[in-house]
């Protein structure tokens, strides 16, 4: 008889939820991310740059992140001068949080991670980062059996030249060009991406504009990650209010890891009394 059955009527909104459950297999990282959005108004990721930490300091940071209410750890950076496998392994042993690779190149892969943001730099026109690195990485990812999360990666002007913009040879989308950003995000959704990542860049002076986040979120059916330039919990809360589904912090946590609880509260619940 099948799932629906003969002659049985199901309301359209219920059918949509059934289809979503079928399309995202249980126990995958994507299923976990969806569950975060069922519990909180948004999710919180901490980005760990392996070049800024030792194996032991990464493990301590992972433990603190979990205790502070962080939802997942992103692992990656613009460079990679250290072996990623021991770092990913130390994080897996120190925390139950998902370890999601955020690769700057095909060299930044590890079988010790749970998943990978399968990034395509859709805001740029450099074919190497639109499809070249993805083709090189695909066989390795399959061999490592990593969960893949297709992600449209968009660089947004953040007030300074960032490492990712320089290394990729890609100009960011200007902050005031909302329609250009909107069109890129919509194109990514139509191409089958599961996430949009709006990136002002590590160490950015300015975060992604809230107006841009709202305009993009209003027309998308997929989740939006926002990172770069988010230096205080109040800025994080502002971006969530604008429509961000997930917030990423990196550089600010490297300088003061005690801020993670304040960020977590602001992102999950809108609590900002610990802002600084």
Per-region residue spans from a language model:
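N-terminal amphipathic alpha-helix/helix-capping segment at the start of soluble metabolic enzymes
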Residues: 2-48, 140-150, 157
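Short, small-residue-enriched loops and turns at beta-alpha junctions
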Residues: 51-54, 80-82, 107, 201-207, ...
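Alpha-helix-loop-beta-strand connector modules within alpha/beta enzyme cores
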Residues: 84-105, 138, 206-231, 263-274
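Short, acidic/polar
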Residues: 54-63, 178-187, 232-236
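Catalytic cores of alpha/beta
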Residues: 101, 105-118, 226, 230-247
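Glycine/Thr-rich beta-alpha phosphate-binding loop at enzyme active sites
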Residues: 167-213, 254, 259-260
């Amino acid at each position: 008889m099948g799932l629906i059955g003969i002659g049985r009527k199901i309301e359209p909104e219920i059918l949509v939820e059934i289809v979503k459950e079928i399309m995202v297999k249980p126990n995958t990282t994507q299923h976990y991310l969806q569950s975060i959005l069922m519990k909180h108004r948004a999710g919180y990721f901490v980005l760990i740059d392996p070049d800024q930490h030792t194996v032991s300091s990464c493990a301590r940071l992972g433990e603190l992140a979990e205790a502070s209410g962080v939802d997942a750890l992103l692992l990656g950076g613009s460079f990679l001068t250290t072996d990623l496998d021991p770092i990913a392994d130390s994080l897996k042993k120190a925390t139950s949080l998902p370890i999601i690779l955020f690769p700057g190149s095909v060299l930044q892969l590890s079988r010790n991670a749970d998943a990978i943001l399968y990034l395509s730099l859709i805001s740029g026109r450099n074919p190497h980062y639109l499809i070249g690195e993805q083709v090189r990485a695909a066989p390795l990812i399959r061999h490592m059996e990593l969960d893949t999360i297709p992600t449209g990666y968009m660089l947004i002007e953040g007030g300074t030249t960032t490492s990712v913009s320089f290394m990729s040879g890609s100009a960011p989308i200007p902050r005031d060009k909302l329609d250009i950003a909107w069109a890129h995000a919509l194109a990514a959704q139509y191409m089958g991406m599961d996430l949009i990542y709006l990136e002002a860049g590590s160490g950015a002076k300015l975060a992604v504009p809230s107006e841009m986040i709202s305009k993009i979120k209003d027309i998308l059916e997929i989740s939006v990650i926002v990172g770069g330039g988010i230096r205080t919990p109040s800025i994080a809360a502002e971006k969530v209010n604008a429509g961000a589904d997930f917030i990423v912090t990196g550089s600010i946590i490297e300088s003061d890891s005690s801020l993670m609880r304040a960020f977590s509260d602001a992102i999950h619940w809108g609590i900002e009394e610990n802002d600084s």
